[in-house]
């Protein structure tokens, strides 16, 4: 199965641009898209997934599950458009830029990046900045 994007909300998002950024990140990081599902949802769904699979009973911006075995990148990620909207306001950025950043972040997780420490978070943030710049120039 190839890259598939699902929007479970009523909000309109640019699925073509999101697919482009996922392919860009996976390709530039040395991977090949195998079977990736990107699910854009609301707070109710992401909270349920966070609780049922990770044991955390709260909303978050993204949850990523990687299933890589071999050369192709396989996995799925969930992004809450509700959290994206509130974070965009909080950080003073556009909804689209925050959505792109978190999509890039999720793709980086599929490529093995981690953000458990401040150093790892800083490294991921630099990669996110790199890809946002690439998309805008």
From Swiss-Prot:
Its main location: cytoplasm. Disulfide bonds: none annotated. Its cofactor is Zn(2+). It comes from the Bacteria. It is an enzyme of class 3 (hydrolase). Its EC number is 3.1.-.-. GO terms for molecular function: metalloendopeptidase activity; RNA endonuclease activity; zinc ion binding. The keyword Zinc applies. GO terms for cellular component: cytoplasm. Zn(2+) binds at residues 105, 109, 115. One of its GO terms (biological process) is rRNA processing. It is found in: Cytoplasm. Keywords: Cytoplasm, Endonuclease, Hydrolase, Metal-binding, Nuclease, Ribosome biogenesis, rRNA processing, Zinc. Binds 1 zinc ion. The keyword Metal-binding applies. SUPFAM superfamilies: Metalloproteases ('zincins'), catalytic domain. Single strand-specific metallo-endoribonuclease involved in late-stage 70S ribosome quality control and in maturation of the 3' terminus of the 16S rRNA. Belongs to the endoribonuclease YbeY family. This is Endoribonuclease YbeY. It comes from Chlorobaculum tepidum (strain ATCC 49652 / DSM 12025 / NBRC 103806 / TLS) (Chlorobium tepidum).
């Amino acid at each position: 199965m190839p890259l598939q994007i699902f929007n479970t909300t009523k909000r309109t998002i640019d699925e073509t641009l999101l697919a482009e950024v996922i392919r860009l990140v996976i390709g530039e990081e040395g991977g090949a898209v195998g079977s990736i599902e990107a699910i854009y949802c609301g707070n109710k769904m992401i909270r349920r997934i966070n609780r049922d699979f990770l044991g955390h009973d709260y909303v978050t911006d993204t949850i990523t599950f990687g299933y890589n075995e071999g050369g192709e990148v396989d996995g799925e990620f969930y992004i809450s458009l509700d959290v994206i909207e509130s974070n965009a306001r909080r950080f003073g950025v556009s909804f689209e830029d925050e959505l792109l950043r978190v999509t890039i972040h999720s793709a980086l997780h599929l490529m093995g990046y981690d953000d458990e420490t401040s150093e790892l978070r800083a490294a991921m943030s630099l990669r996110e900045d790199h890809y946002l710049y690439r998309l805008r120039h």
